[in-house]
Regions:
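Scaffold/interface architecture of coatomer-like assemblies
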Residues: 1-207
Length: 207
């Protein structure tokens, strides 16, 4: 199966809602993939405790739907209240999404949706969040939503300016996840302690 966690920055949510309001009928997905996806909002609530300092993020339940339902679920199926853009803990939320995606023995990914005015106000930097996901072996995809790129220092390899662009990005995400394979390694090992030898031809660790 496939598990995908989307971190949706506020500006990206507004841009996608606008794009999907004026789109035509999407191409129907006839696949029978076992897909689950959820959305996480990068606004954290810090919990101070004598022994621990942690942050929680608003997240939806897992949706078990087709690939073509991702965009409509986000833009029409959720009731999200506006939140201050200056309080977005984007990198922190990406790290939390990585933990959520890695929680099950399934093919997985985190997708960060960035709008034009995205600003990170969290404790982690983008580089620190990326390194954390690499250690977890969770691939990260960054999609830039709208005509202007985000000023944040994420490697947004995918630009989305129309609803059709979103469909193409989802198709590429699905193709990448379908290439993932899960191997069981005997014993108890930290993910970052597992490495490939030169004999592993045509194989790379997910990151």
């Amino acid at each position: 199966g496939f598990d995908v966690v989307f971190v949706c920055e506020g500006g990206a949510f507004e841009e996608l809602t606008r794009l999907f309001e004026r789109r035509g009928a999407p191409v129907r997905d006839s696949s029978d993939d076992d897909l689950r996806f959820r959305f996480l909002v990068p606004v954290g609530r810090t919990v101070d405790d004598p022994t621990i300092d942690s942050s929680s993020f608003a997240a939806t339940a897992w949706f078990q739907r087709r690939w073509d339902a991702i965009g409509p679920t986000l833009t029409h199926g959720l009731r999200l209240k506006p939140w201050p853009r200056t309080e977005q803990r984007i990198a922190d939320a990406v790290a939390a999404a990585g933990l959520a995606a890695a929680g099950w023995e399934r093919r997985r990914a985190v997708v960060l949706l960035l709008g034009p005015g995205a600003r990170n106000g969290g404790d982690l930097t983008s580089d620190e969040a990326v390194r954390f996901l690499v250690a977890l072996r969770v691939p990260l995809f960054v999609w830039s939503i709208g005509k202007s790129p985000s000023p944040e220092t994420w490697d947004a390899a995918t630009a989305i300016r129309t609803a059709a662009d979103f469909d193409v990005a989802v198709a590429r995400l699905r193709a990448d996840l379908r290439r993932q394979r899960i191997l069981w390694v005997e014993g108890a090992h930290l993910p970052q302690a597992v490495a490939l030898t030169p004999l592993a031809k045509g194989v790379r660790l997910a990151r």
